[in-house]
Amino acid sequence: MAGFTLLPSRLLAFPSRALPRRLHHHHAKLILRCKMSSSSSSLTQSITLPSQPNEPVLVSATAGISSSDFRDAIDSSLFRNWLRNLESESGILADGSMTLKQVLIQGVDMFGKRIGFLKFKADIFDKETGQKVPGIVFARGPAVAVLILLESDGETYAVLTEQVRVPTGKIVLELPAGMLDDDKGDFVGTAVREVEEEIGIKLKKEDMVDLTAFLDPSTGYRIFPSPGGCDEEMSVFLYRGQVEKETIRQLQGKETGLREHGEFIKVRLIPYRELWRKTADAKVLMSIGLYEMAQREGLVSSQRLKPNS
């Protein structure tokens, strides 16, 4: 197929597709003004939020958290984005019926020089009843996942990764996915990079369709995979392409990933018609739902791709 090249360095170049343009939506920016004062005797900070100016929030650290990790945690985009979400239009503190009393920083995991994961406990109370709502938070920030569909000889294949997932104790079959490295919000750029690292396919940004951009504005155009305990918000992208059967054969079982980062990945291709029953990965099942409904609404094409189109 013209325009398709299999590179020895594990990169594949896919031709451009005239898929529907990705919708561009952005979160409204909330200017957060915090007044902080530190205590020399313990790791504490007093934060004043705009929504409750007369009720300072005490932020403290559990035993074992260093002063530098405590400061980095408070200054991190993970923590500040969580505070912004509290005061956003649909935030917990928006209507004044609840109040944030204190936050206890319990764990900080560094990814190089930046905070990758943050664990804390927030004490938020309903003002009318005085009852505290569950507030254990595992903060990891925004992420992306990509549904890659490759058509070949009348069959459509989904491209998945097979990875070691220590939290589950299992090897999991899942969509290519990854976290944003910073708070600049380049979701589509991160999606393209993750596909290249995990699958060995080089895509173009303009060929990606943001399936989460079709959601209602009240969602913020993101999906929360586990809102009961984690702040992660995810964008799900779609890529469709047509390839030769030989490409399917070469991708199947291919070993990829950044070994120096502990990524031991195998590429698995599954017929799309069987995808919904082949894995318990929530990202896969979410992407199927988004893709199928977007097709039903005419937001993405349901027609098969033609060679050289």
From Swiss-Prot:
<feature type="short sequence motif" description="Nudix box">
    <location>
        <begin position="179"/>
        <end position="200"/>
    </location>
</feature>
<dbReference type="InterPro" id="IPR000086">
    <property type="entry name" value="NUDIX_hydrolase_dom"/>
</dbReference>
<protein>
    <recommendedName>
        <fullName>Nudix hydrolase 14, chloroplastic</fullName>
        <ecNumber>3.6.1.21</ecNumber>
    </recommendedName>
</protein>
<feature type="binding site">
    <location>
        <position position="198"/>
    </location>
    <ligand>
        <name>Mg(2+)</name>
    </ligand>
</feature>
<keyword id="KW-0934">Plastid</keyword>
<feature type="domain" description="Nudix hydrolase">
    <location>
        <begin position="139"/>
        <end position="292"/>
    </location>
</feature>
<feature type="transit peptide" description="Chloroplast">
    <location>
        <begin position="1"/>
        <end position="60"/>
    </location>
</feature>
<dbReference type="GO" id="GO:0046872">
    <property type="term" value="F:metal ion binding"/>
</dbReference>
<keyword id="KW-0464">Manganese</keyword>
<keyword id="KW-0460">Magnesium</keyword>
<dbReference type="GO" id="GO:0009570">
    <property type="term" value="C:chloroplast stroma"/>
</dbReference>
<dbReference type="GO" id="GO:0009507">
    <property type="term" value="C:chloroplast"/>
</dbReference>
<keyword id="KW-0479">Metal-binding</keyword>
<dbReference type="InterPro" id="IPR015797">
    <property type="entry name" value="NUDIX_hydrolase-like_dom_sf"/>
</dbReference>
<comment type="subunit">
    <text>Homodimer.</text>
</comment>
<feature type="binding site">
    <location>
        <position position="194"/>
    </location>
    <ligand>
        <name>Mg(2+)</name>
    </ligand>
</feature>
<keyword id="KW-0378">Hydrolase</keyword>
<keyword id="KW-0809">Transit peptide</keyword>
<keyword id="KW-0150">Chloroplast</keyword>
<comment type="function">
    <text>Mediates the hydrolysis of some nucleoside diphosphate derivatives. Can use ADP-glucose, ADP-mannose and ADP-ribose as substrates. Regulates the intracellular ADP-glucose levels linked to starch biosynthesis.</text>
</comment>
<comment type="similarity">
    <text>Belongs to the Nudix hydrolase family.</text>
</comment>
<dbReference type="Pfam" id="PF00293">
    <property type="entry name" value="NUDIX"/>
</dbReference>
<dbReference type="GO" id="GO:0019144">
    <property type="term" value="F:ADP-sugar diphosphatase activity"/>
</dbReference>
<dbReference type="GO" id="GO:0080042">
    <property type="term" value="F:ADP-glucose pyrophosphohydrolase activity"/>
</dbReference>
<dbReference type="GO" id="GO:0080041">
    <property type="term" value="F:ADP-ribose pyrophosphohydrolase activity"/>
</dbReference>
